[in-house]
Structures are given as structure tokens and as C-alpha cells.
């Protein structure tokens, strides 16, 4: 295989990877030959996923981790450093949470919940992984952002959008600051994707129809459609792409007005 399209011999950490988009990312990374460590807050889901990956012959290990805890983040990175001999090629900051409310109804706990999970954890993981990424000689960071960080999606709430917009900016900053260390940073911004977390939205007929009417492809995304882009950004073939926020949204963010029927 052309080395540009292989992750053979490379190592990766994916957060929140026992289900949903994170699970799909692990499957895609493993398919390209990467060795992967994952973390998840649910021990039950994590163990189930690890068993499934073992049956498929994937090189995946895992740790239970509450990413909102600074000591647990530090412990996780110590584990990763030990497993991968002080080197890491890929960091995928996938963990994300959402409490959808009108802005006037958010309380202090909601603010802390979003910031600590969606933003602070990703920021700290980048700091902790920097020496490992630099030592590897080829580092790639991918943030799982959202179209909510690019355009206003009122139904997702302003706090969620705030944290995702911040991740997009963090990708730009790190791309410039850490390029000299051989590290690239990008963000992927999906539309609504079919996962357990999005069911509250997709089961509401009026919300779903409203979203699909503004999405040229007329549907929600699939986890593997997001995973394929994430993994592409980690491949040597994408070595000149950094600092970008790429929307994978069925055309939502470019939709203006059209009298033509959707797909």
C-alpha cells in the first residue's frame, strides 16, 4: 500500500470512543493499521467495545476516564505514554456533551458542564500530548466540533455552540503554534449524526423536518461518514492540511435559498 494512505506503525488516542462517532473513528483508524488507545466514562460500554475490536483483530486498548477530571486526564496520558513508548501520532478529541436550553435558562452548573467536558478537557489533552506528538515526528490533532460552532443552531443551545466555536479557534491557533514541532491540528464540524446522543433531536418530527429542509442532501449523517474524514486528516496524504474546520454537514452551512426540491 502507498504509505500516504496507511497508518501502519502509528499510534492514536481517541476520547469518548466506546460508542457513536468515537467508535466509528476507532474502527476506521484500525482499518488503516493504527494502534489505538481509547477512553470512555462507561466501563460497561468500554469493555463491550474492546471485546468487539479484539474479535476483529484490531490493536485497541482502553481506559475508563472521566475527562472532566484533571487527575484522570493526567493518569490517562501517563498510560498512553507508557503503552506507546513516549510517542503519539494522533490525538482525536471526540468527547462532547449537550444540554439544550434557551440561553436565559442556563445556570452555573450548565456552563461548567459544557466548558469542562467539551473545551477544557480537549485543551488539556492537547497540552499533555504535545511532548508525545512532537517526539513521534508526525503528529495530528483532530477536534470533533459541530456545525453549531460555525452557524447558529438554536435547538442545540448557545453553550454548546460556544464550546464548539472555541475548538475551531483552538485548531487554528495550534496549527500555527505547533507547526514547527511537526504537529498539525484540524477540526471536523458535523451536522446532526445518528447516534444515541442525537435521538432527542431526530425523534422530534418538527425539528428533524426543519433541519432536513435546510440540508441539501436531506438527511442526517452516519458515524462512519464523519470517521472517514477524521481519519483522512490523520493520514500522510493530508500532510499539507492544517488549521482548518471542515464541515461534514450535507450542505447545511452553505445553504442559502432555493425553490428546488431537496435530494
Curated annotation (Swiss-Prot):
The UniProt annotation places substrate binding at 146
Establish whether keyword Magnesium is in the entry.
no
| A UniProt-annotated Pfam family | adh_short_C2
* UniProt-listed Enzyme Commission number(s): 1.1.1.-
Residues that hold NADP(+) according to the record? 13-37
In this protein, the active site sits at 160
Key word Mitochondrion present: no
Q: Which family does it belong to?
A: Belongs to the short-chain dehydrogenases/reductases (SDR) family. SDR65C subfamily.
Spell out the protein name for this chain. Answer: Tropinone reductase homolog At2g29300
- Give the originating organism: Arabidopsis thaliana (Mouse-ear cress)
Amino acid at each position: 500500500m502507498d504509505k500516504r494512505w496507511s497508518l501502519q506503525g502509528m499510534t492514536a488516542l481517541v476520547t469518548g470512543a466506546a460508542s457513536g462517532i468515537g467508535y466509528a473513528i476507532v474502527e476506521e483508524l484500525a482499518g488503516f493499521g493504527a494502534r489505538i488507545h481509547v477512553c470512555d466514562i462507561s466501563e460497561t460500554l468500554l469493555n463491550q467495545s474492546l471485546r468487539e475490536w479484539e474479535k476483529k483483530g484490531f490493536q485497541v486498548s482502553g481506559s475508563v476516564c472521566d475527562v472532566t477530571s484533571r487527575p484522570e486526564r493526567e493518569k490517562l496520558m501517563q498510560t498512553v505514554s507508557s503503552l506507546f513508548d513516549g510517542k503519539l501520532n494522533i490525538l482525536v478529541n471526540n468527547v462532547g456533551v449537550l444540554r439544550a436550553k434557551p440561553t436565559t435558562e442556563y445556570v452555573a452548573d450548565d456552563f461548567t458542564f459544557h466548558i469542562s467536558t467539551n473545551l477544557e478537557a480537549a485543551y488539556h489533552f492537547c497540552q499533555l500530548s504535545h511532548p508525545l506528538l512532537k517526539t513521534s515526528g508526525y503528529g495530528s490533532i483532530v477536534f470533533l466540533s459541530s456545525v453549531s460552532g460555525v452557524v447558529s443552531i438554536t435547538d442545540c443551545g448557545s453553550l454548546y455552540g460556544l464550546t464548539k466555536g472555541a475548538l475551531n479557534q483552538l485548531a487554528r491557533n495550534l496549527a500555527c503554534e505547533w507547526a514547527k514541532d511537526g504537529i498539525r491540528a484540524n477540526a471536523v464540524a458535523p451536522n446532526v449524526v445518528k447516534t444515541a446522543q442525537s435521538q432527542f433531536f431526530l425523534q422530534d418530527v418538527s425539528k428533524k423536518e426543519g433541519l432536513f429542509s435546510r440540508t441539501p442532501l436531506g438527511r442526517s449523517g452516519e458515524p462512519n461518514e464523519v470517521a472517514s474524514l477524521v481519519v483522512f486528516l490523520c493520514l500522510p496524504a493530508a500532510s499539507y492540511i492544517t488549521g482548518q474546520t471542515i464541515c461534514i454537514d450535507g450542505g447545511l452551512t452553505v445553504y442559502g435559498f432555493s425553490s428546488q426540491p431537496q435530494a
